[in-house]
Amino acid sequence: MLEDLDLKINNWIINTVNSFIKPNKLDKIAECALQLSKIIYYNDMNVKKYLEEINLMQKELNIKRESSNINFSRPTQIIELINEYMFKEQEFKANIHDYQNPLNNFLNIVIEKKIGIPITLSIIYITLAQSVNFILYPVNFPRHFLVKYVLDDANHNEIIIDPFNNGRIMDDYALKNLIDSFFPNQNIPLTKKLVEKANLSQVMIRILNNLKDSFFEIQEFDKLNIANEMIFAIDPKNTYAIRDKGIILQEKDPEKYLELLNTYLELEPEANDADIVLKIIKSIREKYR
């Protein structure tokens, strides 16, 4: 099992992390997500097959663009074109009834079922847009992944798009309502930081964290461990991965468990779960002294 894990992580590092994620090759965002699916769950999956399906959609969208009367100086018209193709012709839709299902994080399943959550629908949206030379960037918005088109980076002139809501254009009012819906009564200000461009590392780590939460709920600790090690391969100093590795090791290696939890608190002394982690440390020390 350990050798199998090492092989998976080594493949992830060589074929995806070093090749695409670290250089932040956004044109490979779909391939990264598919490799993630293959390593964690669908070991026999043919990644090339799904890339060919994406490529076919890209070609169809490009043909649609060439036959249209779109004014390319007006980004909203290009957004309308992508929305028409993705949500009406291809019939991709938001999985509002089974949002927490871990399958929503696997791009191969989203391509097959035409249903997903904000982050996977955003990956498809970004990839389709690339085929018509419309460069979009991922946005790691709290609790709800978005994408954006940058008109003028220096002056923060941009268009925020929500692929989970059929490509709706989000103005500041809509964004504020969205964040208030997730954090009621906290009056979190809408800042430029919340809609910053995300890099490939942040996108893949967000998917992996989603999966970790799901695997923890269903007690699939082997899969949780794989996802956690995949995060470490991207970011060896990821504080939540350090904490979760400690939790995974708590029965196998309590001393290492304590070391990791202490490291987590050193890196995140103001963490929301700091009090809980301190109680765990105390209970482990009492148990093994």
Residue ranges and their predicted role:
Residues 1-289:
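A structural boundary/capping signal
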